[in-house]
Amino acid sequence: MGRSSKSVRLLAGVITLVAVLVAPTAVSGAAPSGPTGGSAAARWAASHDGPQPHAGVNVSWDVPIRMSDGTVLRANVYRPADARERPTSTKTPVIVNMTPYTKLVSSIGSAVTQHPVLEPFLLQLARSINLSGTPIDGINDIAHTIRDGGAKTFLVDFDLVRSGYTQVVVDVRGTGFSQGKWDVFQDREQRDTVEVIDWASKQRWSNGKVGMSGVSYSAINQIQAANKNPKALKAIFPVEPGGDLIRDIVAPGGALGVGFLPLWLTLVNTTKMIPNVASMLNGTFDWKWLADRIADPLTFYPQLLAGLFTPDIASVPPELKELLETDSEPRTAWLDRAENITTPTFIYGGWFDLFTNSEVRMYNKIPLPPGKKQLIMGDGYHLTIGGGQQGRAGSPPRLDVLQKAWFDKWLKGIDNGIDSYGPVNLKQVGDSWITARQFPRAGMERQRLYLSDRRSGTAPYAVRDGSLTPTAPQSRARMTVAPGLAPVCSRDAAQQMAGALAIFPGCSDDARISERAALTFTTPPLTTTRSVSGYSNVRLNTVLDATDGYWTATLNDVAPDGTSKVITSGQVVASLRGYDRATSQFAPNGDVIDPFYNLTLSTRQRVAPGRPVSIDIGLLPTEAIVKPGHRLRVDVFAMNFPRGLPLRPLLNESGLRPQHIQLDPNRPSFVNLPVSTPIG
């Protein structure tokens, strides 16, 4: 009896010891749950926000990095340090950020937003800003990028550095304090990025493992570096990356991106002229830098001006012509080639970002297993990184938290569960966040909804109020729409201007103003909830009075009170309607659902005035919920300024004449949608 009792006590002791030893491991290994990441995300946040092994940050300013052609780039190097800013002697992983916006901006922004006194004040200010219900309540989302961690992915994250990383911020060639001519993502600039990665891996403070971080431009060059698979590059965290710059922002659908390009080019070409004042004071001014700036003061402006002012096709200059041919050096350099990437990649994008066209394509092309590649798609704009939602209840963790967890996994080998997150987290337009295995989500059915001239009674203010029906109309009708400026107040305008116009929600959140220049086609109220997940296409049977025209279509969610919110949109210049069948996607019935436009002069197809021509308008991919009582609507416009403006020769050929949809039972006009349950 005594021996038995002793055995029981011994067994109980062993079980208790095992429980004590195993329990922390079990908790730390708990898999992330849903979009929020569950308890795993709480540990990621604690790892980022809690006490760090290093108290300070040591900065080396304007470190020279010589490229293989002799050009010198300049970098700021941020290293973990003690409280007196003495750098650690321990070798660390390195995070590289290549920026065209001058590292001066990054250093000032980081110093202000992460100052020990100013940071709490700014965070509290961001939390306290609430302009909801005012004409400028879109400012809320911009302010919340500080709270949501988006700002730290653009700037330098001092918490990340103090946790044991070195961050290197480099002015790309021809910008900031770096020598050379700004190459705008082309081959020489891409080679620079690879050489910087190699340089960073071999410094005395580096352990040889390199990651990359950054937003927008600094996300695109991450993708470009990763597709070359440099040996030292172990992980990337691109926020809002583009993968096909012609189709994303330069000329989506063949229309010049006038709402974004002039302002962006002016920003970079202006800031690259800011001299290194410190070098002027200490006698080390770089005269080669000055000579390079004088030689190339307005990079890419000749192409922009040619697109705006060249009167006809015969007069198109070489610098513009090369952008309008598939095999030209810029066009090939601007493709993501994500199918070559083997580096763990975490992509953050948005349904109303500048680069929505590319973000999900990129994720799907990367030949890595889910987990080693991750995708988050929010519903914010380019400037509202995180959309004011990250870190809130029901939403993914803050971006700075996710970024550190990603680097901890792939650069430090910490088994924190980030590779079990997602792999695809999607903000459903009109609803909440969901986690999926893929995008588009499985289980969608393709459905045609046909454009009809029968009045829906929901848009009396539109040019024409039509219906959207599950069966094709049996009568013929012609509906005419003329180019107009109402889309200046629209979600497309807000999207093209990176979200700057979204501070006025009356334009971005309700399409009824822009619909005054549109033909609208609306369903009856839905009786059950429908999901829309994937690519949609609007097929129009058109007639033009000129040899060219410009078509835009949007898919909208119309609430019972009449509010019309754009879910997704697309556009195409009529003569550039041709698409590459090998790259485009098709529905089982043969309908094109994702036309990959050629956008070249050599494949241009002028329209015969007065003759019907079928036009396919591919809409950007989306994930949306349409609730009972709401309606779906297709809007059709003949102009979409400032989202786009046809190249001047094509605009001149259009004459800005009215454009017609010819409704014909033999050549129906329709939208092909990916829906959870057929409508009607």
Name every feature range the model reports, one short phrase each.
Residues S47, R392-G680:
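C-terminal, loop-rich substrate-recognition/catalytic regions characterized by aromatic stacking residues
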Residues R204-S216:
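Alpha/beta-hydrolase fold nucleophile elbow
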Residues A46-T90, L526-T528:
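N-terminal cap/lid segment of alpha/beta-hydrolase-fold proteins
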